[in-house]
């Protein structure tokens, strides 16, 4: 599903050039659950932004579903992104002025799906995430765990092939964090590829493979036997 070749990201100011990622080579298969770990500032979130086509690499190649996308225009990348990738963030990133239903519906509006089909798809995912009873509430009326359930619902409502999760349990207590990890595991069991940045050794144990970054480099990869292509 994903392959990177010597992926590099530089940030340049007038005086300083900083290397955020340097010669990162990855091969991530469909239906895999991969955790990316490393100290703060080592390039974890930068890598996730590149994989999600929210930013461009400074050098190297990025293949997504057998297409070399790093040279695509922003419009081309946006079209691929909205059809294939869902995002889950530590801070939820819900829109305060929209209800739970409207937040989850948003990706479907961008895809031009009819109102009747949107209603069915949103209700299906809210039922699956056990948050249907909150459909008309606003984010500020929800607990942290409920907000993250809504965020996950929004990420998966369009049935993307890939979920990118950046510290999905970082703002949650242990019980709600465990629920979110179980939801991600269920999605992965259903065939969704998941790449998750985490600082939590516990959360990383849900993955098939753990990739360790340090100073912008992949330093180790630990595989688990439970994933089979």
Q: PLM features: what roles do these ranges have?
A:
Residues 209, 217-229:
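Conserved beta-strand-loop-alpha-helix hinge in the C-terminal portion
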Residues 2-210:
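ABC family nucleotide-binding domain
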């Amino acid at each position: 599903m994903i392959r990177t070749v010597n992926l590099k990201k530089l940030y340049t100011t007038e005086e300083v050039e900083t290397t955020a990622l340097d010669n990162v080579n990855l091969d991530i298969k469909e239906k895999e659950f991969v955790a990316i770990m490393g100290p703060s500032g080592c390039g974890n979130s930068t890598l996730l932004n590149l994989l999600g086509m929210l930013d461009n690499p400074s050098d190297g190649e990025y293949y997504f579903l057998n297409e070399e996308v790093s040279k695509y225009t922003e419009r081309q990348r946006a079209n691929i992104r909205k059809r294939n990738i869902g995002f889950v963030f530590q801070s939820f990133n819900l829109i305060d002025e929209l209800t739970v239903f409207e937040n989850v519906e948003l990706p479907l509006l961008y895809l031009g799906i009819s109102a009747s089909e949107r209603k069915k798809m949103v209700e299906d995912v809210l039922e699956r995430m056990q948050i249907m009873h909150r459909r008309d509430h606003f984010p500020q009326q929800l607990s942290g765990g409920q907000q993250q359930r809504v965020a996950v619902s929004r990420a998966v409502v369009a049935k993307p092939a890939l979920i990118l999760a950046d510290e999905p349990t970082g703002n949650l207590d242990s019980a709600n964090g465990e629920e979110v990890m179980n939801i991600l595991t269920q999605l992965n069991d259903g065939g969704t590829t998941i790449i998750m940045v985490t600082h939590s050794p516990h959360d990383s144990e849900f993955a098939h493979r753990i990739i360790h970054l340090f100073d912008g480099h992949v330093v180790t990869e630990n595989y688990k036997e439970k994933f089979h292509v």
